Amino acid sequence: MTAVCATRTEARAARHAGLRTAVVGVGVRRPLPDGRLVSFGLAGALHEGLDDAEVLDATRVVDSDGRTLWEGEPLGVEGATRATLLAVDRVFDDPAERRVLHQRTGADAADMESGALARSGRLQGCVRAISDTPAATLGPIAEMLGDNGRLSLHGVGRAALRPRETARSLSRVRHALRRLSEVSA
């Protein structure tokens, strides 16, 4: 199995856990590797029931209408929470939007890669760590990522104007990645 990651940083956490990795870009911008796939990386919580850095072993991926794209057994990650992931095409940082998505789909968290992996027909499971919650959003970091999944220079500039908030968000992301590599080992 290959742990498919959006970023090199997520792939480093997966390799630390002893997994073979492939980096496909945010929102899956590169070809998927051959064989069985595991969606591995960060996710944003859609409700307050999930904590920062909580690790999820998802058993279901749904689309924006709540339709199941993939369903399977958990991978058995010790200490992980079973969850449903929502496949999205952009970061949802607004707490009100997150609540609506949770109510409409029943999903616990959202990410931008699991949907494409589910549609490939080769997804075996999803291991994700919560990087942000409705109470502790990504803030400036979310602005750095444009709607197309690419780095936005305008967003980087805005994040630079809010260094404390950016530092807090980055700290939460680092903590989630650390937990992901520890729990998955």
Task: Give residue spans per PLM region.
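Glycine-rich phosphate- or other oxyanion-binding loops that anchor nucleotides, phosphorylated ligands
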Residues: 1-185
